[in-house]
């Protein structure tokens, strides 16, 4: 029962090891190494530093306990999964913005043809009984056609810049870089007032969901990654991360 509960608790570690393989290490501390090694009929096995299960074969590395690779496990691994999911969301958003910028640019070059089509077809549609003058899409299209070319060029540039911003943010988060986390918090926070302004003009599902995701991302990164000195800052985060390492846990178990 206890073993099953441990597997449930370590499911993300097991999934990660299943995808990327186990990580084993032989410390030069004999007593500590003995707690990580076992013998079977198939040969020696070593405990994985991430999931804690035994893996068949020799250790992948040897050395002092303090030189063991820093493996993401426990809370750190769960944080990495969440942050990478946020990074994927940012990259998808960057792609959508880039496509929007391309669409506006293409529209800017095809305004004449679109206007000619509307001038030719709208009267026909009205005569056929279609209430085209009440269609939101038609109003939006006519408004866009009335915009100056310089305005459309400015919109294209702003969308492209925002796409680049989201792409940088997404890459930094996916790579789990500290600068990416800081960049994400600052870049996202800058646009929160604009999102509040949009919500004040009218509440829509898209606006509410976008605002909620961004606020949650900022709060989560600040608290979980201890950015800008929150909860002790980087030093406290490193201490917490080191405390989750299997070798440290095993050393602590030896002293009890």
Swiss-Prot record:
<dbReference type="InterPro" id="IPR014511">
    <property type="entry name" value="DUF2068_TM_subgr"/>
</dbReference>
<keyword id="KW-1133">Transmembrane helix</keyword>
<dbReference type="InterPro" id="IPR021125">
    <property type="entry name" value="DUF2127"/>
</dbReference>
<feature type="transmembrane region" description="Helical">
    <location>
        <begin position="203"/>
        <end position="223"/>
    </location>
</feature>
<keyword id="KW-0472">Membrane</keyword>
<dbReference type="Pfam" id="PF09900">
    <property type="entry name" value="DUF2127"/>
</dbReference>
<protein>
    <recommendedName>
        <fullName>Uncharacterized protein Mb0093</fullName>
    </recommendedName>
</protein>
<keyword id="KW-1003">Cell membrane</keyword>
<keyword id="KW-0812">Transmembrane</keyword>
<feature type="transmembrane region" description="Helical">
    <location>
        <begin position="155"/>
        <end position="175"/>
    </location>
</feature>
<dbReference type="GO" id="GO:0005886">
    <property type="term" value="C:plasma membrane"/>
</dbReference>
């Amino acid at each position: 029962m206890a073993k099953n509960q441990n597997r449930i608790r370590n499911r993300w570690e097991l999934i990660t090891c299943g995808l990327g393989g186990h990580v084993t290490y032989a410390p030069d501390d004999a007593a500590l190494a003995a707690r990580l090694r076992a013998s079977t009929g198939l040969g020696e096995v070593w405990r994985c530093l991430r999931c804690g299960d035994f893996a068949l074969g020799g250790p992948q590395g040897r050395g002092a306990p303090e030189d063991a690779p820093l493996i993401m496990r426990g809370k750190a691994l769960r944080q990495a999964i969440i942050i990478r999911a946020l990074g994927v969301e940012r990259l998808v958003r960057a792609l959508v913005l880039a496509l929007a910028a391309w669409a506006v640019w293409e529209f800017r070059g095809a305004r004449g043809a679109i206007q000619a089509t509307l001038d030719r077809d709208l009267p026909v549609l009205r005569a056929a009984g279609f209430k085209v003058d009440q269609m939101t899409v038609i109003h939006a299209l006519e408004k866009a056609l009335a915009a100056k070319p310089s305005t459309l060029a400015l919109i294209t540039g702003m969308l492209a810049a925002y796409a680049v911003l989201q792409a940088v943010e997404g890459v930094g988060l996916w790579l789990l870089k500290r600068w990416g986390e800081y960049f994400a918090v600052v870049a996202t926070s800058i646009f929160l007032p604009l999102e509040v302004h949009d919500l004040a003009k009218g509440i829509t599902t898209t606006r509410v969901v976008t605002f909620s995701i961004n606020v949650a991302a900022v709060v989560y990164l600040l608290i979980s990654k201890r950015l800008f000195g929150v909860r002790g800052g980087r030093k406290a985060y490193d201490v917490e991360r080191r405390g989750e390492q299997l070798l440290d846990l095993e050393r602590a178990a030896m002293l009890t």
